[in-house]
UniProtKB/Swiss-Prot annotation:
It catalyses: tRNA(Ser) + L-serine + ATP = L-seryl-tRNA(Ser) + AMP + diphosphate + H(+); tRNA(Sec) + L-serine + ATP = L-seryl-tRNA(Sec) + AMP + diphosphate + H(+). Consists of two distinct domains, a catalytic core and a N-terminal extension that is involved in tRNA binding. It comes from Klebsiella pneumoniae (strain 342). GO terms for cellular component: cytoplasm. It is an enzyme of class 6 (ligase). The keyword ATP-binding applies. The keyword Chaperone does not apply. NCBIfam families: serS (TIGR00414). ATP binds at R268, S269, E270, E355, I356, S357, S358. Homodimer. The tRNA molecule binds across the dimer. This is Serine--tRNA ligase.
């Protein structure tokens, strides 16, 4: 959520910056609502003061033995007017809040301006895509060759965009997640967390999934109950529970940064992606991801973004997977982000780079929703923290890249040396 004071005092400047990301802010409506809020605020305060004064007069008149009925009727009328004004003010404030919750974050000044993914800017590349001297198989074909990816079984169990992994490929999938966690906790300074996969509405509001993206979530409720705000939703990313661990907290600045990681399944309805990536593991309703979250002082967040992106890059480098780093343009960034880097790994069967990590500085956008603050030891003043999140990495897509980049002419899949301790020394699958 943006700073309400900024929306009140500089709506035109905010609108100009939001326009860079293709969002049209209705400044006239905001101004009209703000003017009405001011009127109702003054009216409510005046009515409250008048009723208090008249109520005091009743006691004084009663002490003098005077007829208090006219004063009592007047106080009752003032009370009715006050209740009506309060009700209108509450309705108006709710409308303003709903508008504010639907406004995306302001892009950082150094984010490239653009409409969509075609306007993203490549920052760097690492590694050289392998030149194969045989016909490249995609990960689905390889998975079926080794009996490790069973999409038909998943359709029987659940439906499309799910998979059953078996045998050595299931083990490799687990090994990747363990390797990522070990790297982030032992070398990058993150603390490992195990978090709920179901979260409540407040948690989803805190990180920005609600109210705007309710349709992207899988919601749960007991069959005998009606859907309501007490129902849970499956997490779309571990960013949601990890970041909300600091909701309504005041953290000593000396305790920052807080760096957390977790390996979880992620659940997404993939609304709006019908027909895209229907084959294989690229776009699933359920997929595993190792997530990184940092809670930092405001002045440290831009440096933290570079650091976090480097942590995700390190995973790819140690696995020997070619990738490129891309700065997302204003029109392609996520709702809550003020600056984002995507890492795209080389997928040989598609002859292109595909997203495998997204690392974002969210500034104070989520912190304001969560009321997550830090306190300076010197002056004891509090201020909102900055939050960052990044994939470190998407495990299924890493498996795809590894299978395709390390495939052999006979269909075997070489295990990168760094993963072999997690695979009991296994060098090849197949």
């Amino acid at each position: 959520m943006l700073d309400p004071n900024l929306l009140r005092t500089e709506p035109d400047a905010v609108a100009e910056k939001l326009a860079r990301r293709g969002f049209k802010l209705d400044v006239d409506k905001l101004r009209a609502l703000e003017e009405r809020r001011k009127v109702l605020q003054v009216q409510t305060e005046n009515l409250q003061a008048e009723r208090n004064s008249r109520s005091k007069s009743i006691g004084q008149a009663k002490a003098r033995g005077e007829d208090i009925e006219p004063l009592r009727l007047e106080v009752n009328k003032l009370g009715e007017q006050l209740d009506a004004a309060k009700s209108e003010l509450e309705t108006l404030l709710a409308e303003i809040r709903d508008i504010a919750l639907a406004i995306p974050n302001i892009p950082h000044d150094d984010v490239p301006v653009g409409r969509d993914e075609n306007d993203n800017v490549e920052v760097s590349r690492w590694g050289t895509p392998r030149q194969f001297d045989f016909e490249v198989r995609d990960h689905v074909t390889l998975g079926e060759m080794h009996g490790g990816l069973d999409f038909a079984a998943a359709v029987k169990l659940t439906g499309s965009r799910f998979v059953v992994m078996k045998g050595q490929l299931a083990r490799l999938h687990r090994a990747l997640a363990q390797f990522m966690l070990d790297l982030h906790t032992e070398q990058h300074g993150y603390s490992e967390n195990y978090v709920p996969y179901l979260v409540n509405q407040d948690t989803l509001y805190g990180t920005g999934q609600l109210p705007k993206f309710a349709g992207d979530l899988f919601h749960t409720r007991p069959l005998e109950e009606e859907a309501d705000s007490s129902n849970y939703a499956l997490i779309p990313t571990a960013e949601v529970p990890l970041t909300n661990l600091v909701r309504d907290e005041i953290i000593d600045e000396d305790d920052l940064p807080i760096k957390m990681t977790a390996h979880t399944p992620c659940f997404r309805s993939e609304a709006g992606s019908y027909g895209r990536d229907t084959r294989g593991l690229i776009r699933m309703h359920q997929f595993d991801k190792v997530e990184m979250v940092q809670i930092v002082r405001p002045e440290d967040s831009m440096v933290a973004l570079e650091e976090m992106t480097g942590h995700a890059e390190k995973v790819l480098q140690l696995l020997g997977l070619p990738y490129r780093k891309v700065a997302l343009c204003t029109g392609d960034m996520g709702f809550s982000a003020c600056k984002t880097y995507d890492l795209e790994v080389w997928v040989p069967a598609q002859n292109t780079y595909r997203e495998i990590s997204s690392c974002s500085n969210v500034w104070d956008f989520q912190a304001r929703r969560m009321q997550a603050r830090c306190r300076s030891k010197s002056d004891k003043k509090t201020r909102l923290v900055h939050t960052l999140n990044g994939s470190g990495l998407a495990v299924g897509r890493t498996l795809v890249a590894l299978m395709e980049n390390y495939q052999q002419a006979d269909g075997r899949i070489e295990i990168p040396e760094i993963l072999r301790p997690y695979m009991r020394g296994l060098e090849y699958i197949g």
